[in-house]
Regions:
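Pyridoxal 5′-phosphate
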Residues: 1-180
């Protein structure tokens, strides 16, 4: 889906642009797209650290403060709303912890968008993934918010579409059926 692609794009971009900061921080309760992308991060020589969660599924912020380290942690990638439990992550606090250490923040907001307030001005994440089918758009459509504060290396390169962030011809529905 578009959400899965955007998660992979963020992880690949950060891994490529900040190779000296080797660590990706996630939780064990992330969506499979994050967990599988983390496996790739590890295969490419990076380290993946799992932040613990409390019994109710909330991220342990005290442990996160100890895990996220300046010059070591490149990216903290934690979902805003859990797709299985509905637990909401304290994203504002996660952003504060990560940014204080110089790390970037990605959130999978697929389950949160449209259900709880998601505002990148009040919660200044660096990357935010969305999936259209959760908002009545066609399946496979997604969106990736990239803050103007950060660099981004495109996952797909080619024709430079989407302001050179995702190349490829857009899949559009014709306004009328093709003629025979």
């Amino acid at each position: 889906s578009g959400g899965t692609e955007s998660i992979n794009a963020v992880h690949a971009s950060v891994r490529s642009l900040w190779p000296e900061s080797r660590e990706l921080v996630i939780t064990g309760t992330e969506h499979a797209a994050v967990l599988e992308s983390a496996k790739r991060w590890r295969k490419q020589g990076g380290k993946v650290v799992r932040a613990p969660v409390h019994a109710d599924g909330r991220v342990d912020l005290d442990a996160l403060r100890e895990i996220v380290r300046p010059g070591v942690t490149a990216l903290v990638s934690i979902m805003w709303a859990n797709n299985e439990t509905g637990v909401l992550a304290p994203m504002r606090e996660i952003v504060e912890i990560a940014h204080a250490a110089g790390a970037l923040v990605h959130t999978d907001a697929v389950q949160a968008a449209g259900k709880v307030p998601v505002d990148v001005k009040s919660v200044p994440v660096d990357f935010l993934s969305l999936s259209g089918h959760k908002m009545h758009a066609p399946k496979g459509v997604g969106a990736l918010y990239v803050s103007k504060r950060v660099r981004f290396e495109p996952f797909l390169i080619g024709g430079g579409q989407e302001n050179e962030r995702r190349s490829g011809t857009e899949n559009i529905t014709p306004s009328r059926p093709p003629r025979p």
